[in-house]
């Protein structure tokens, strides 16, 4: 007769396999006794500014006999990673995403930390350091977060003129990029209250509300309102842009100038008419406070206030005030210039 496995023995045999399969089905690798070579980072979020040098830590506790370390960036809103650099501990090869700005720190033989020089706005995001040794691959994830400022933007034609791609280009033309949801949320916690919906980098459309009111989503609770999934080509909204610290300086030139005269005034001083992102960055990082409207490169007239006071914008909070888009021939304003250092 064929031999039979007693039920208790069969269950004892089956349970470990079932537990392992269930554990993997949940997306968590089953525990294994093998060594862990990568040390967990002390800080998973690294803060930096545009133009600075950032170091993303990735350190081995011990070195396997043969291995490679692969650095990549996890693209927001996309299920893919972009390769940055691969090293075998002796030699490294970069793959062009960060150009010549990315290198290994090599503080010691177990140091695979990534250095990014001259940090740019598009460098913000999530990065992965992966150890590949042919047996048990492992990785650590880190987030590079830039200090900056979010500003709403609409063109001279009025609100809700941009599809996603036009909003993206508009932010870049104003020395910024489309803000992420995380950046908009941070700006909301710092006081951003805006009743017009705008595109974000991930392709969503949202707006931040601090004071709930009927014309602005109703009398519900404060928060980030969402319009849900939108068609990137067809649907039209404003843009929420993000910018960071400047390499140069913004300064005000007084007068009663037309827009063309404003450009000439800045050129005479070795500068250009400032962009909207330049003015917001100077307000945020340099404390620029000027109670005079000035032309900007997009044809708008704005002024930055860090200390609210009577007859200076009429609002109780700091911010960048706007006079909209006057006629370019209207000789009523000074100008804000931007000069590289």
From Swiss-Prot:
Tissue: Brain. Predominantly expressed by neurons. Colocalizes with versican V2 in developing and adult cerebellar white matter and at the nodes of Ranvier.
Residue ranges of every copy of the Ig-like V-type domain listed in the record: 35-143
Signal peptide bounds: 1-27
One GO MF term attached to the UniProt entry: hyaluronic acid binding
Keyword terms of this UniProt record: Disulfide bond, Extracellular matrix, Hyaluronic acid, Immunoglobulin domain, Repeat, Secreted, Signal
A Gene Ontology biological process term: cell adhesion
Gene Ontology, cellular component aspect: extracellular matrix; extracellular region; node of Ranvier
Annotated SMART domains: IG, IGc2, IGv, LINK
Pfam families associated with the record: V-set, Xlink
Chief location category: secreted
Cysteine disulfide partners in this protein: 58-129, 171-241, 195-216, 266-337, 291-312
Keyword Ubl conjugation tagged: no
Subcellular location field: Secreted, Extracellular space, Extracellular matrix
Gene3D superfamilies in UniProt: Immunoglobulins, Mannose-Binding Protein A, subunit A
Classification via PANTHER family: AGGRECAN/VERSICAN PROTEOGLYCAN (PTHR22804), HYALURONAN AND PROTEOGLYCAN LINK PROTEIN 2 (PTHR22804:SF8)
Function recorded in the entry: Mediates a firm binding of versican V2 to hyaluronic acid. May play a pivotal role in the formation of the hyaluronan-associated matrix in the central nervous system (CNS) which facilitates neuronal conduction and general structural stabilization. Binds to hyaluronic acid.
Family: Belongs to the HAPLN family.
Name listed for the protein in its UniProt record: Hyaluronan and proteoglycan link protein 2
Organism this protein belongs to: Mus musculus (Mouse)
Designated gene of the protein: Hapln2
């Amino acid at each position: 007769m064929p031999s039979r496995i007693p039920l208790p023995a069969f269950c004892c045999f089956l349970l470990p396999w079932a537990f392992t399969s269930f554990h993997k089905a949940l997306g968590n690798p089953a525990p294994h006794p093998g060594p862990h070579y990568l040390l967990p980072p002390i800080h998973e979020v690294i803060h930096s500014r545009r133009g600075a040098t950032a170091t993303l830590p990735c350190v081995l506790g011990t070195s396997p006999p043969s291995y490679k370390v692969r650095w990549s960036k996890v693209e927001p809103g996309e299920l893919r990673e972009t390769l940055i650099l691969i090293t075998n501990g002796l030699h490294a090869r970069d793959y062009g995403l960060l150009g010549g700005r990315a290198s290994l720190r090599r503080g010691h033989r177990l140091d695979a930390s990534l250095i990014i020089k001259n940090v740019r706005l598009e460098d913000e995001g999530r990065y992965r350091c992966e150890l590949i040794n042919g047996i048990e691959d492992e990785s650590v994830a880190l987030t590079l977060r830039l200090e900056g400022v979010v500003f709403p933007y609409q063109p001279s034609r009025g609100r809700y003129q941009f599809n996603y791609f036009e909003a993206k280009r508009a932010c870049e033309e104003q020395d910024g990029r489309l803000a992420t949801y995380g950046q908009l949320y941070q700006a909301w916690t710092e006081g951003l209250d805006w009743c017009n919906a705008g595109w974000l980098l991930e392709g969503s459309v949202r707006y931040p509300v601090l004071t709930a009111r009927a014309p602005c989503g109703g009398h519900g609770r404060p928060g980030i309102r969402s319009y849900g999934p939108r068609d990137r080509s067809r649907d039209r909204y404003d843009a929420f842009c993000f910018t960071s610290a400047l390499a140069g300086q913004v300064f005000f030139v007084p007068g009663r100038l037309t827009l063309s005269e404003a450009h000439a005034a800045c050129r005479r001083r070795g500068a250009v008419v400032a962009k909207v992102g330049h003015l917001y960055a100077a307000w945020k990082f340099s404390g620029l406070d000027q109670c005079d409207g000035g032309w900007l490169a997009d044809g708008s007239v704005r002024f930055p206030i860090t200390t609210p006071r009577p007859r200076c914008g009429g609002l109780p909070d700091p911010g960048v005030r706007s006079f909209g888009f006057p006629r370019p021939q209207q000789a009523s304003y000074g100008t804000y210039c931007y000069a590289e250092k």
